[in-house]
Structure formats: structure tokens, C-alpha cells
Amino acid sequence: MKRIVILMLAVVSLSILANAKKPKVVKPSPFVQMKSGHFERAGKPYYYVGTNFWYGAILGSEGQGGDRQRLLRELDNLKAMGIDNLRILVGSDGEQGVTTKVEPTLQKAPGVYNDTILAGLDYLLMEMGKRQMVAVLYLNNSWEWSGGYGFYLEHAGEGKAPRPNEAGYTAFMNFVSKYASCEKAHQLFYQYVKDIISRTNRYTGLKYTDDPAIMSWQIGNEPRAFSQEAKQPFAKWLAEASALIRSLDKNHLISIGSEGSWGCENDMALYEQICSDVNIDYMNIHLWPYNWGWAHERTLRKDFEQSCRNTKQYIDEHLQLASRLSKPVVMEEFGFPRDGFSFSQESTTTVRDAYYRFVFGLVADNALSGGNFAGCNFWGWGGEANPTHQQWQVGDPYTGDPAQEAQGLNSVFSTDTTTIQVIREQVERIGSAGK
């Protein structure tokens, strides 16, 4: 009997020891995370090619502009190309009927929302989640095409925002430069941030803060100070906004949406200041050779080499900063016009394809060598749209070009087979960086 008891105790002891030695299994986070200067997703390195799909929430709605069947086809086509990262506008602000602004609007007046668009955003996130795609959602805009700065300033009592197509961009930028210092405008925006981030998806039942289909909250699309005097108030506002987002959501990444030094009055020190903030998880840069005067309407082909030289210099400067800060970099906007500055889908894209290949190559080379580049989003996906007017009109299909731009200027359509082939090649190359 004594021997049996001793044997039983021995077995129990061995069992306890065996269980004690088993390592605790930690389930990888379903959210995209930033670790040691790189992205991780589901515990694995995450490198990607994505696109800009600003109109996704509108397309996902069942009201004006909604087309859920098209949305599903576009998501399926993008996923088949290997694209799993979409940069999307949460919603536009202000009055409708403005030629250069996208509609329908989400926020008609501060705190007054178009529930149809919110349902569209819910639906979009649900369908992206089904396809293991992730969204970068931007909450504001310095430019007129979705309201943004101008909308909040108007409702803060600063007067009517000039329309760039009527008064010119100088008048517009002078007006919106007041945003950086306008506390009342900030408070209106902060309430919007709280309302959006605290939402629960009506289709999935998931709180937005718990939804892995969201990769990042982005403060705005190309936020700028717009004047030398506004630079420090601008930095202060970004710090406040990122701290607010962090207090509301501990799961998701936070980004600024900046163009880089170009969006900081060409002040690299200011860009470093805003990216150094503890709540900013990764850096963004944009590249627009035509918009920035590196390439010109009549000499696109001739200006190609200079555009590439300027592009590489711009990228290198920002990669040096990323290395110092140990933060990932995403080239989240870049584009180039079609050959001959044509807006027609029938036109060729030889120079654009070459520019895409060049930018993708710089991103891939850096990522494959262990650098800070983590991904890129080309601008923008036009998909199956067939524009019927050069100037967007209500009822026209949405393209990658918002209402203030000629339809077809920067869009990549499903029929652009040569561009899509370039994208497919680079999806595979950049995606291999973490393997």
C-alpha cells in the first residue's frame, strides 16, 4: 500500500512538473501593430501594396451614390491583385451642391450625421473583414474636396471658406491657415472624432475599437499649417488630436496623413517634430510630380527623369528620419498623369507605368534590405468606373479622382492592364520582404 501511495505521488509530481514546463501560448494580436520600426499582423511581418479608395463608404451605402454590388466587385478585384490595404475617407462635411466637393456628405453640420453614409462605412468594414483586408481611415482634410478645415472654420464663426475654383488656391489657403489656431474649430472636430471612433458596427456588432479590419486612424488627408506663423499651433493641434484618439482606442495604430516635408511648409524640422510624437506610430509621405511642378502637362515624358531624381531625393531624406525615429514609413499617395495628359481610359499609360515601377522599386529595395519602408498606396483606384464627364457631376460613377479633379487624371481603371501588371509584380516583390 505504501509503495502504491509513493508511486501515485510521483505520478502527480511529474504531471505538475510537465505542465509547469509547458510554455504559455500567446495568441497573436489580430490588429496591425508597430514593433521595432516595422509592422506586424497576426504575429507576422506585414509589408503591403495598397491603394486609395476614398469613396468606399459612399459606395457601401444604400442611398445616393451607393452601389454595394460594385463595391463587392471592386473589393474582390483588388484582393485578387494582392491588394489588402485601402486608404479611405470616413466622410465629407458640409453643404451639398458644391461643384468641387464630393457628395453625399456625412456630416451636414457639426454633430449632424447622414446615417446612410455611416451604414455604408459599417458595410464596407464588414466586407473588408471578410476578405482579410484592412482600412486606413482618415478623419479630416485640409483640402476643399471633402469639407474638412473649411467646414470647421465656417462653423467656428470664421466666415465662408473661399472656393478654390472661384477665388483661387491662394485665397483658400490663406483662409484655412486659420485652422491651426482656431480652438473652436478643433473642438468641433474632436467631437466628430469621438462620435466616429466610439461607433459600433450595425452589421457585425463589433465596436470600431475592436475591429481588426481597421489598421489605422489617420488625423487627416494631407494636413498642413498653410503658413509659417501657423506651424507651431499646427504641431500642437496634431499632438492633441493624436492623444485624443489614443485615449479612445488602444488597439489601432495612429498616423498623421502628412505629405512629408512638403506638407510642413518644406520644413523638415517641423515634420520631424510631428512624427516624433509618442502617439504617432508610423510616418506617411506623398509624391506628386505633376502637382509639385516636377513634371508639366506638355512635357510629361521629357520630365520623367527629373521627376525620378526628385522622387529619390525626397524619399531618401524621409527614410533617414524614419531610421532615427525607428518608425515604419508608408508611401501612401503617389500618382502620375496618363500619357499626353489625357483623361480618357483609351489613352496609354507608358510614363505612368514607368513612374509606378520606379517608386515601387524604391519601396521594395528598402524593405527587402531591412529598411523602414513598410508599404505603399498608389492613388487611386478607379476600378470599373467609366467617367461620363470631365468634371464630376451628381450621378456619375466615383473614380480615384475626387470632385475637384478631372475624372481620369490619376485613376487606375480595371482596363489599365499594363499598370495593373506593374502593380501585380510589385505586390509579390514587396510582400516577400517579411518572408
Feature roles, as predicted:
Residues 25-295, 301-328, 334-434:
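Active-site mouth of glycoside hydrolases
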